[in-house]
A protein has these predicted regions:
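Soluble oligomerization/assembly scaffold segments of membrane-associated complexes
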Residues: 2-142, 148
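Interfacial amphipathic helix/helix-coil modules
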Residues: 128-170, 179
Length: 179
């Protein structure tokens, strides 16, 4: 699970010690207490709006999942967590669906007297049993790594050069307008 202070009370990250510094106005690490504890809904909204990025390639239908965070280690950890949770959710959902189908088909086999219908139902049970076996066999169920999450070595943003250029440009415009 995502450690809530890493998401909601994050202030900065020390690359030298690989430690997270929390905003003491929001979260006090020594007492493990919040000024006002955020709700799950607030945390979800912040995670999906500020950190999680999903992109689908129109040509290949590949989905890219990425997480942005000042700490590249947290970004990697959260990316792996999202992928694992989605895989686990859909695996369990499909497993439950197949188990219900097998149960229903077995009931129908017990209730029918026609040998032809029993044979067709038995084949359907066999197909669902194959699905169940494959569901448990795949480590990656929905999402599979093409390029596994990695700790990025270079900062992705903000671009200091771009910020300096914009500030210089705005300074030049304001000096022309004010003079």
């Amino acid at each position: 699970n995502i450690f809530l202070p890493d998401l909601m009370a994050f202030e900065s990250w020390s690359s030298d010690t690989n430690t997270v510094i929390y905003d003491k106005r929001i979260y006090e690490t020594s007492s493990d207490s919040w000024d006002e504890e955020p709700s799950a809904q607030e945390a979800f909204k912040k995670f999906t709006s500020k950190h999680l990025r999903l992109a689908k390639d129109k040509n290949s239908a590949f989905i890219t999942i990425s997480v942005k965070h000042q700490s590249p280690f947290l970004a990697k950890q959260w990316t792996e967590l999202v992928i694992n949770k989605v895989n686990e959710f859909y695996r369990e959902k499909d497993k439950e669906r197949s188990e219900k189908a097998v149960s229903y088909l077995n009931q129908q086999i017990a209730m029918t007297s026609s040998s032809e219908i029993k044979q067709v139902l038995a084949e359907l049970v066999q197909d669902e049993t194959k699905k169940l076996t494959l569901i448990d066999a795949n480590q990656f169920y929905v999402f599979e790594y093409i390029d596994p999450p990695a700790v990025m070595e270079k900062k992705s943003e903000p671009s200091r050069a771009l910020i300096c250029i914009i500030i210089a440009f705005l300074g030049g415009i304001s000096s022309v307008l004010l003079v």
